[in-house]
Amino acid sequence: MEEEEVLEVVEDEKAGPAAAEKRGPTDTLGSAPAASGHYELPWVEKYRPLKLCEVVGNEDTVSRLEVFAKEGNVPNIIIAGPPGTGKTTSILCLARALLGPALKDAVLELNASNDRGIDVVRNKIKMFAQQKVTLPKGRHKIIILDEADSMTDGAQQALRRTMEIYSKTTRFALACNASDKIIEPIQSRCAVLRYTKLTDSQILARLLKIVEKEDVPYTDDGLEAIIFTAQGDMRQALNNLQSTYSGFGFINSENVFKVCDEPHPLLVKEMIQHCINANIDEAYKILAHLWRLGYSPEDVIGNIFRVCKTFQMPEYLKLEFIKEIGYTHMKIAEGVNSLLQMAGLLARLCQKTAAPAAS
């Protein structure tokens, strides 16, 4: 690649979605190099919401952020929730709504999993909080700490004092997966908002919009497979969609599972059906096949549980199956992750449905 092209790609990455829109549609689709010689923007970035009203899911929590944006007086906030649910995006949308053109000068964004030590609080954060920035009346500078639960205890202790000292000029917005890893003194200084995983229907609605805009050929079972592999994570869903389209040019379940490479739910479904029929030999053949393909016990047991939840079977039997799957998952998580454990699970599932032996 020419040096000029390398510089252009680096500048585009720094500029973000706004620069992508200026370059035009031919430069921003997909993930492989286009004929024009430009690299294409990941769809996760291209379709990242710019306004709070565009954020998918968690309507109640997002509506609270919209109230903050409208009134202008934002408290320090912590947004906690699983990955890919829009925590950082929501904070950026809030900052954009509050600060408008001053966004570039008045926002400091740090990823706390990299900048996690006490030096960052003492240097970067403190220096930014001390800077004088001209802002509209009633607005504050915003410091965004992504993955704040990765910060060391020492850094968090130093941060709480900084939050108090600069409370007149600066607001802190923390995004984390688990709020219990944030120390109590910081939690008490913040409004804690919680995000949940997105529902299948919410992910499907956004996927349909994107495949329409990008003119992606797809089948219904292909989108179902993407939703199944995403597990409520919108980022994962968009990455899987783009990877499948870039690799195969067509979205169907077969192509999706080639890209995502996890135990195929149809195979798992067939295995559960054999267990319901008390056919241990056929069930074990499928398990041995999955094992030979190199899937870890965590992958297999996770998919067995997810398929079992939606499997059509008597309710009492489903409860028994899920109980046994849970016990086996616990043993695997503790490190006893052999094929024998998985085979034992199949034997116990078959035992639940087998006719009692004649006395």
From Swiss-Prot:
Region Disordered, residue ranges: 1-35
InterPro entries the record matches: AAA+_ATPase (IPR003593), ATPase_AAA_core (IPR003959), DNA_pol3_clamp-load_cplx_C (IPR008921), DNA_Rep/Repair_Clamp_Loader (IPR050238), P-loop_NTPase (IPR027417), Rep_factorC_C (IPR013748), RFC_lid (IPR047854)
Domain of life, source organism: Eukaryota
Localisation per UniProt entry: Nucleus
Swiss-Prot/TrEMBL keywords: ATP-binding, DNA replication, Nucleotide-binding, Nucleus
CDD domains, per the entry: AAA, HLD_clamp_RFC
SUPFAM superfamilies: P-loop containing nucleoside triphosphate hydrolases, post-AAA+ oligomerization domain-like
Sequence ranges of Acidic residues compositional bias: 1-11
Gene3D superfamilies: 1.10.8.60, 1.20.272.10, P-loop containing nucleotide triphosphate hydrolases (3.40.50.300)
Quaternary structure annotation from Swiss-Prot or TrEMBL: Subunit of the RFC complex, an heteropentameric complex consisting of a large subunit RFC1 and four small subunits RFC2, RFC3, RFC4 and RFC5; the RFC complex interacts with PCNA. Forms an heterotetrameric complex with RFC3, RFC4 and RFC5; this complex has ATPase activity but is not stimulated by PCNA. The heterotetramer of subunits RFC2, RFC3, RFC4 and RFC5 interacts with RAD17.
Family: Belongs to the activator 1 small subunits family.
Entries under PANTHER family matching the protein: REPLICATION FACTOR C / DNA POLYMERASE III GAMMA-TAU SUBUNIT, REPLICATION FACTOR C SUBUNIT 2
Name recorded for this polypeptide: Replication factor C subunit 2
Species name: Gallus gallus (Chicken)
Encoding gene (name): RFC2
